[in-house]
From Swiss-Prot:
Binding residue positions for L-glutamine: G47, E48, S49, R106, I133, R134
A GO term, aspect molecular function: glutaminase activity
InterPro entries hit by this protein: Class_I_gatase-like (IPR029062), PdxT/SNO (IPR002161), PdxT/SNO_CS (IPR021196)
Gene: pdxT
A GO-annotated cellular component: cytosol
Protein name (record): Pyridoxal 5'-phosphate synthase subunit PdxT
Keywords: Glutamine amidotransferase, Hydrolase, Lyase, Pyridoxal phosphate
Pfam short name (any one): SNO
Gene source species: Desulfitobacterium hafniense (strain DSM 10664 / DCB-2)
Phylogenetic lineage: Bacteria, Bacillati, Bacillota, Clostridia, Eubacteriales
Length: 199
């Protein structure tokens, strides 16, 4: 199995380490040629979403990656990656891939709670460690979006077809369960193409 990891900015190395520990080949996606390579899954890491979005377009990566996501490529998106997937941003007119029918608020916890750690229920996995760093949260979800996790009533994890979007960083705590769940969704072989309007 080969998974592409967006590697233009942000916390991609930590994702790669977990995937490699799980026996998965990683392909760092750094340019348009990389973005057109065949991969069985995609990770959009945390970082700075505005910078990532700008680089995706400048490096000719945006359209090929969006086409793959729309066609049903499994995606795990964390923090800034969630912002890239969101159809709508509550406090920003920008849109990026816009394939995940959720409304996301950037830097939702403000400065005082900009970074924090907790352990909360995540789907069927039980309690998992969650590290939030200037994190967004999901204000609302569209039809058929499964809510996987909440913290203090705020939605911080969702699944829609082949897309998993998280407000937090599962790669920072040494817990592999969320990545394993993502890989299981790939090996399950189900593909759910999106019916999303073009950006």
């Amino acid at each position: 199995m080969r998974v592409g990891v967006l590697a233009v900015q942000g916390a991609f190395i930590e994702h790669e380490k977990i995937l490699q520990n799980l026996g998965v080949e990683c392909l760092e996606l750094r340019n348009g040629k990389d973005a057109r390579q065949d991969v069985e899954g995609l990770i959009l890491p945390g970082g700075e979403s505005t910078t990532q979005g700008k680089l995706l377009r400048e490096l000719d990566m945006f359209e090929p990656l969006r086409e793959k996501i729309v066609a049903g490529l499994p995606v795990l998106a964390t923090c800034a990656g969630l912002i890239l997937l969101a159809e709508e941003l509550a406090n920003d007119s920008a849109r990026y891939f816009a394939t995940l029918p959720v409304r996301v608020k950037r830097n939702a916890y403000g400065r005082q709670l900009g970074s924090f750690y907790t352990e909360e229920q995540f789907g069927d996995l039980g309690k998992v460690p969650m590290t939030f760093i200037r994190a967004p949260y999901i204000e609302s979800v569209g039809e058929d979006v499964e809510i996987l996790a909440k913290v203090n009533g705020d939605i911080v994890g969702v699944r829609y077809k082949n897309q998993i979007g998280l407000s937090f960083h599962p790669e920072l705590n040494g817990d592999r369960r969320i990545h394993q769940m993502f890989l299981d969704s790939i090996s399950g072989g189900k593909s759910f193409p999106c019916t999303q309007k073009a950006v």
